[in-house]
Amino acid sequence: MRKLGKLTAIVLGTLLAGSMAFGLVGCGGGPQEGQTTIRFWYTASISENRIMQDMIDDYNKGQGIEDGVYVDGDNRQNIERTALYVDTPDVLTVTDENFKSWAIEGLFTDLSDYYANDPGDYTEEGIPEAYTQTFRIDKEVGENGIRMAGEGADLQGVPFGADPMAYYYSLPAFEDQGINIISVAEEDLDGTGTYAKVQPHGYAEYKESPFEGAVSSANLAGDTVYKVFNNRIPMNWEEFRYLSKMFTRSSAYNPDSPTTYGSGTHWWFAYAWSVGGDCIGWNGENYDFSVADEGANYLVLSDTLELNDKTYYAGDIVSYQDRAAAADAPEGSVHELPSTYDALYEFVRLSSPVGGNGGRGENGYGIGLFSNDNAAGSLVNGEIALLASSESAITSLETSYRGKYDIAPAQQWREYEGGSVYYDGAETFENEYLKVIGETYDDVLYTGELAADEATGTPLVGRTSAFAGFTSLVIPARSDASLKDAAWKFIRWAASEEGQRYVMQMSDVPNQTSLAMSDDYYAIGSGKNYWALAFQAQTAEIGDWAYFENGEWVNDWSGSFNGQLRAGYTTIEGFMESDGAAADRAISEVDIYLNGRF
């Protein structure tokens, strides 16, 4: 479904050409002798602009002297694409949402040779694939009439930063429910030290205290337990809906909840992508509209597995195109995962009301706030306890909720030994409860251990992925040809570690994993869990609005998806009957192939 806006970010609109704000950035006294001046257009907020000024000034006084380049920065609030035809800048920031359509118009310079022959300190090694593949698209259409984007395509933009989705949660709400919050990476839960008794869950309940200082409280079943939320491990689907249930004020769920609803989650990507689903699936010739596909997905268990000339490794999720081959794979080499339909159904039930508005829609959980924007105000005002948002929410939260929120990763499909839930009576959501670690169910002690394949030891987990907004640096095709070498020298520096240290000061996740997953980046959060943002960015993907040359194909069905299906006014079957055929036709006519995308 389509992204509905960001509160603040490095964003390009399509509004007033040439509008400017916050002035030029010609700091540092002008170019020195031997420096060639280039123009750099970008968009930034007031606080971000100060950082951009510092970055440009640092380059001009340092690497720029060695390169013989002086950057004249210009903070423009909106840049119309027509401005790239006349009086174009030499370097420009472009978001993923605009990138492909502008690239197809021929508005960018192919940077492949620059990167191959003169990379400087910039290298794609150590940068997540989604960063680099997002801004690769061939200049020409192939002989089959399809233009390739992604892996192996022409480099038309260099990744400058990412703004990933994560969950922002209310500390007062969690305290009200007696939840103990820890921040321990999964690899550090090795059965030793302070958290030796803690299992790798995003949220779990324990019969006995799992660590010194943990406080107990009553759970939804009325039992005294130790509730533990680990903001460095994704919750699985059951944990997320249980926690959302805990924070939904209802006589059937929790009449004492401090919030009206549990969560505000507008995007379904984390559910679908975790099990290998998506709203599109490549069938070998074109794309299918696969948002409600009922075919099984597969997790690879064996060390390696060849499917249709593609090599998969243990822990990989099989692509849509290779699922049929996976179904016939040797016994024990794959593990069946939920279908894309299952993922969609779980997501829709979060916001669809119980009973589905008198049976018109899916019988939902009624635990999620239905909102198109999921504005930070819903967290601040006590409507929800968990908010799905890009890091742009931080600006609003720091203004009106400072010190009262923190950050956690998105959901992930994860399987635990003995399952995750039990029922007290009929198998309805009202009667569903999370299993308590240390309790006995059906004469079996529940340990809460992560499930793994018995033969291979492969953990039974899906992908950890959610969407991100990516920004690139490009050289406009119609810029001064004599200045393109100079423009490239600035780009390669800005995308290297030295330049990315400024990007991360704007809270955007830098392109290099070693820098993103570092104490230097975490420290920028001033105690908040910026690890979650960095972690999420490593496996993030572009949203469906940026898959192809424009988002029009999404507009054909997203209105019904968001306004009817998610709100509980139609079922998945009803949605597919009304919108599926048109969406399938629209996607089958797309002439771009996303190479390397799961």
Model-derived regions: residue spans:
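Periplasmic-binding protein-like
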Residues: I491-S518
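Glycine-centered hinge/linker elements that transmit conformational signals in sensory
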Residues: W237, R241-T248, N283-N372, E398-Y401, ...
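Extracytoplasmic "Venus flytrap"/periplasmic binding protein-like
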Residues: D58, G62-V141, D176-Q177, I182, ...
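Short, polar/charged alpha-helical segment
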Residues: S45-G68, Y168, P172
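Conserved C-terminal helix/tail region of periplasmic/extracytoplasmic solute-binding proteins
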Residues: Q500, T513-S526, A532-F598
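A bilobed periplasmic-binding-protein/Venus flytrap-type ligand-binding module shared by bacterial periplasmic
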Residues: Y168-L171, G469-S482, Y502
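Hinge/lid segment of periplasmic solute-binding proteins
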Residues: D96-A166, P172, D188-G213, A408, ...
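Extracytoplasmic/periplasmic solute-binding protein
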Residues: E143-F160, M165, G193-D328
